Amino acid sequence: MITYDDEVVCAPRAGTLYDVLELILDRGMVIDVFVRVSLVGIEILKVDARIVVASVDTYLRFAEACNRLDLEHDVRSKTVPEMFGSPMAKTVGRAGARRTARSLTDKVRDVLTPEHEHEEEPEEAEDRPRAGAERGRSTQRPRSRPAARPRDEDDRPRSRPRRRTEEEDR
């Protein structure tokens, strides 16, 4: 049983929908959700949602008590476009572009060099000592491809001689 200050006894009764809504609007019901998902310091997802079933006065009292009246941008958090606009991201992008260009030039060089040069390269590679075996104090890194040399007119790519088939040799 419920008793009030007036010492009036009220029997519990089933409330109507109107009574429930009046109680909710009077006291208010606020579901406040703030979710931030970060991976290694990079903010991937940020959700700030409020579901409010309350009177305006109740909501304003709640927001003021929780310091959630305004949803401003947090200067400490970075968004994905800000991450890609940073100088660090630009240098990483340049390095990737350089690697891609290098691999493309290697592929073109492989296609344009005659095949008999490719057959000699494995023998030369066996004769040379491995770079990992000699751990000297050199200042240069071992190169994975031959050093670039100045180009002359004789260095232009030439067409490959056509191979003869067995039938043509007879």
Swiss-Prot record:
Which InterPro entries does this one have?
Gas-vesicle_GvpA-like (IPR000638), Gas_vesicle_GvpA (IPR047870), GvpA (IPR050530), GvpA-like_CS (IPR018493)
* Record field: compositional bias (Basic residues): 138-148
Compartment annotation: Gas vesicle shell
Inducing or repressing factors: Constitutively transcribed at low levels, repressed by argR.
Q: Which GO terms describe its molecular function?
A: structural molecule activity
**Keywords noted in UniProt:** Gas vesicle
Transport is among the record's keywords: no
Bias regions of kind Basic and acidic residues — which residues? Answer: 104-119, 127-137, 149-170
What cellular-component terms does GO give this entry?
Answer: gas vesicle shell; vesicle membrane
Region Disordered: start and end of each range? Answer: 86-170
**Quaternary arrangement and interactors, per the entry?**
The gas vesicle shell is 2 nm thick and consists of a single layer of this protein. It forms helical ribs nearly perpendicular to the long axis of the vesicle.
Please explain the role this protein plays, according to its UniProt record: Gas vesicles are hollow, gas filled proteinaceous nanostructures found in some microorganisms. During planktonic growth they allow positioning of the organism at a favorable depth for light or nutrient acquisition. GvpA forms the protein shell. It is not clear what function GVs perform in soil bacteria.
Q: Which family does it belong to?
A: Belongs to the gas vesicle GvpA family.
NCBIfam families attached here?
Answer: PRK09368.1 (NF006872)
This chain's protein is named Gas vesicle protein A2
Q: Which organism is it from?
A: Streptomyces coelicolor (strain ATCC BAA-471 / A3(2) / M145)
